[in-house]
């Protein structure tokens, strides 16, 4: 039920390592593609009840897949909404092959808003570090 942290400067694409307990100054940065990406992820986290922390959020349900060392596929769901995440957490292209079962159906891409269909069987190639986050009201 935990969430990833955004470390200082990540939202600007800054890749310098800061001392953990020291407050390093962050150089001036202009908003960019990375900033917009983080804004959308943070907005999704606030707008999707399924992604709330603790008991308020949806339970984590793993969707079993053929490449569990590289693919993270899961659902979080509340009575208000459902979020389905398909993530290739490796630098390698991976052949994703798995059934989505009861989670198949129409969704919105959480970052673009594009309407998409999640088929009952996924059989596709996912480039390294690629992902899809899908959401829909219940």
Tell me the role of every PLM-derived stretch.
Residues 1-138:
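Carbohydrate-interacting/catalytic domains
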